[in-house]
């Protein structure tokens, strides 16, 4: 094969100009190997190189510089062949590499079809940055396949330290009408920082983080990082068992945690020991992480996401997060993460106006912006955007073995007029305020999750009375596994914040929740939202002095654990944190050991005992979502601030739950019950082990055959002030 004149190698000026400014849809049509009428030509662009040689086995042929940092050579052979490039930059040793522009597209036609239809359930395998190895005639070529969806761009390039952030070096090709641009770059592997240089129709260059990046630089840096996982999971037994668990009939108590401030400075790897031990000791069945996807502003607590596929690098690597989740599974504890598909921040290096146009966000500002939060709203009606989000849900379940997604701000998605004044929202096609596209997205997401990952949970933070949030999609519901009971939370906290002397006038705030308790599959949440923004901590909401605050918290928690519904408690409340929570410092662990620390220790001990009793007494969890699991024994004793109800299990078991929410003890309080004989005391918040008043209570109470309040039996018991007792029926 004999080199020919460089004059035969020139690129047409129009194409060269587009390549020069990185707005060519097909750089592969000019770079790499191409057959000609009388042979073949190879071209390569190597910015700043002083020499480029074609390597054919043991032969090296100097390529001709033809301007614009392009080197070319013409050969007599018209048949395709494998080769390498030997590139020399000033002052550096030569580098031998495969040519990026000889590789076939890394996405197939089925991939692009599924993406355009919004049905690619493993989107992360084909978009973003995926490390790959190709077998060639001259040996293996290892590198990274880059692909990005940017349909409005006129050119896209991969930029990074490996090419001096120069968009002319690694221009990507467009895969037809799919809107996807792709390029395989040899010798690029894990640890490389990169972005996509987007050339917009308006003539601007926008350097963007990869929407599908699996890792990002530590904020405030904004680059994406190539990453590859070699983690070996140890939780196969847990994952197999998860698919068989019926959440409706099993105990579920969730410890909500912000990983960065639980204990300051802890990494995922350190939390895999410290946090796991702590949660296991308290007896929780699940832990819920506030958002762990990458986010630029720590003060958002993770709820303004910039990298939906990237675990935040604040606390370690993706594999270290996998290790943390694996450690929870080894202790029999499920892991839920907060997931934010409702909106995203306007940072110009992230998703916002990604290719110069409204792409991920809705183009109409009346639907595309959330003014309260200063964010953009996803365009749920666009198939590729739905695919991005649905696949993201599957990604966390598949790649990180999470057991559930708590979906944030669902109400803001469901209503077109959410937090909008007249004239700031557009009705749907039927003239209503329901966001039909968001409804369709949520139904699709839930149905897909349940089909692909049986046993995985989806939990809605939904603050309105939208019907059928947890009803199946085939029956017109949204299809969530569970819904936060915001009404219960608001009424309960409002009641317990009042002085006992005034509570009799607010008795219905506690009883009203049972009117609708079984209309959805509810979680009772006391979350981070209730201890921030000037609301104070639970401790500070309780009226009275230290003793009364501690007693109030113990009674509140007992009421929560007895009430129908699964449980969620935010970190710090289990020790009676006195100040409201801030992400800027760790929990005040010293409160347990400091002055009056016994009261805080008592609250922690009670939470441990509540979780234990909740698991052991089937009546407390088996019929959380059925009216057959609950009976009022005393709902109307407002004058004494007393509530009594019975929880029922499938096996006929019963748990009598007594709450005295006043400052006055009732030494001989009579209650009608359904079961005669003995009722055994299994929990007493007034006990000395919780630093209560330790009023002496018998281990059992007896129920006699005397009709009372519609029940065939009557029992008489001592109900101490500001306390709760659980009794189980023994017959």
Curated annotation (Swiss-Prot):
Q: Main EC class of this protein?
A: transferase
Assigned keywords, A-Z:
Carbohydrate metabolism, Glycogen biosynthesis, Glycogen metabolism, Glycosyltransferase, Transferase
Q: Which domain of life is it from?
A: Bacteria
Chemical reaction(s) catalysed: Transfers a segment of a (1->4)-alpha-D-glucan chain to a primary hydroxy group in a similar glucan chain
The question of whether Transferase is a record keyword is answered with yes
Subunit structure and binding partners: Monomer.
Q: What protein am I looking at?
A: 1,4-alpha-glucan branching enzyme GlgB
Q: Which gene encodes it?
A: glgB
């Amino acid at each position: 094969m004999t080199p020919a004149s460089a004059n035969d190698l020139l690129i047409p000026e129009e194409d060269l100009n587009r390549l020069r400014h990185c707005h060519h849809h097909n750089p592969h049509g000019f770079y790499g190997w191409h057959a000609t009428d009388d042979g073949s030509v190879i071209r390569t662009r190597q910015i700043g190189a002083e020499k480029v040689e074609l390597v054919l086995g043991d032969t090296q042929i100097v390529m001709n510089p033809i301007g614009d940092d392009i080197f070319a050579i013409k050969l007599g052979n018209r048949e395709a062949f494998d080769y390498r490039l030997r590139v020399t930059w000033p002052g550096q040793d030569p580098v031998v590499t495969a040519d990026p522009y000889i590789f076939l597209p890394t996405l197939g036609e089925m991939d692009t079809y599924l993406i355009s239809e919004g049905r690619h359930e493993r989107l992360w395998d084909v978009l973003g940055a995926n490390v790959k190895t190709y077998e060639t005639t001259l040996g293996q070529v290892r590198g990274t396949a880059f692909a990005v969806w940017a349909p409005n761009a006129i050119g896209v390039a991969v930029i990074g330290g490996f090419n001096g952030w120069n968009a002319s070096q690694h221009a990507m090709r467009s895969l037809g009408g799919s809107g996807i641009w792709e390029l395989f770059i040899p010798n690029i592997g894990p640890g490389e920082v990169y972005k996509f240089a987007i050339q917009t129709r308006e003539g601007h260059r926008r350097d963007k983080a990869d929407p599908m990046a699996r890792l990002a630089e530590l904020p405030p840096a904004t680059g994406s990082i190539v990453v590859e996982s070699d983690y070996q999971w140890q939780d196969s037994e847990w994952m197999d068992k998860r698919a068989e668990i019926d959440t409706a009939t099993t105990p579920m108590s969730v410890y909500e945690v912000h990983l960065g401030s639980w204990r300051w400075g802890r990494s995922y790897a350190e939390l895999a020991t410290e946090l796991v031990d702590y949660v296991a000791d308290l007896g929780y069945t699940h832990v819920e992480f506030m958002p762990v996807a990458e986010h630029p502003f720590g003060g958002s607590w993770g709820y303004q996401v910039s990298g939906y596929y990237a675990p935040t690098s604040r606390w370690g690597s993706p594999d270290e997060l996998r290790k943390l989740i694996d450690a929870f599974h080894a202790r029999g504890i499920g892991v839920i993460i907060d997931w934010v598909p409702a909106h995203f921040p306007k940072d110009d290096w992230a998703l916002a106006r990604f290719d110069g146009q409204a792409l991920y966000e809705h183009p109409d500002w009346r639907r595309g912006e959330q003014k309260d939060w200063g964010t953009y709203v996803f365009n749920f009606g666009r198939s590729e955007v739905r695919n991005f989000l649905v696949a993201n849900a599957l990604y966390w379940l598949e790649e990180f073995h999470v057991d559930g997604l708590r979906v944030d701000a669902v109400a803001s998605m469901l209503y077109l007029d959410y937090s909008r004044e007249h004239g700031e929202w557009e009705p749907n096609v039927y003239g209503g305020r329901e966001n039909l596209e968001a409804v369709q997205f949520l139904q699709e997401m839930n149905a897909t999750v349940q089909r692909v990952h049986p046993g995985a949970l989806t939990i809605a933070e939904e603050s309105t009375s939208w019907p059928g949030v947890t009803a199946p999609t085939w029956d017109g519901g949204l299809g969530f596994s569970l819904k936060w009971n915001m009404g219960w939370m608001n009424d309960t906290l409002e009641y317990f914040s009042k002085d006992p002397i005034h509570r009799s006038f607010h008795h219905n705030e506690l009883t009203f929740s049972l009117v609708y308790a079984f209309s959805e599959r509810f979680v009772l949440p006391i979350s981070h939202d209730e201890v921030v923004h000037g609301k104070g901590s639970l401790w500070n909401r309780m009226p009275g002095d230290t003793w009364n605050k501690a007693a109030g918290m113990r009674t509140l928690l007992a009421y929560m654990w007895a009430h129908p519904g699964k449980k969620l408690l935010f970190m710090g409340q289990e020790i009676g944190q006195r100040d409201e929570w801030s992400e800027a410092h760790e929990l005040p662990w010293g409160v347990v050991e400091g002055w009056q620390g016994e009261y805080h220790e008592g609250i922690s001990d009670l939470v441990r005992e509540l979780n234990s009793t909740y698991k052991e007494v089937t009546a407390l969890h088996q019929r959380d979502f059925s009216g057959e699991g609950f009976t009022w024994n005393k709902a109307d004793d407002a004058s004494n601030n007393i509530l009594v109800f019975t929880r029922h299990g499938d096996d006929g078991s019963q748990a009598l739950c007594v709450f005295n929410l006043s400052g006055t003890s009732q030494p001989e309080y009579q209650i009608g019950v359904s079961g005669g004989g003995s009722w055994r005391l299994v929990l007493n918040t007034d006990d000395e082990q919780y630093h209560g008043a330790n009023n002496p209570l018998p281990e059992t109470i007896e129920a006699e055959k005397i009709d009372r309040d519609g029940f065939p039996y009557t029992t008489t018991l001592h109900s101490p002030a500001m306390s709760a007792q659980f009794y189980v029926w023994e017959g």
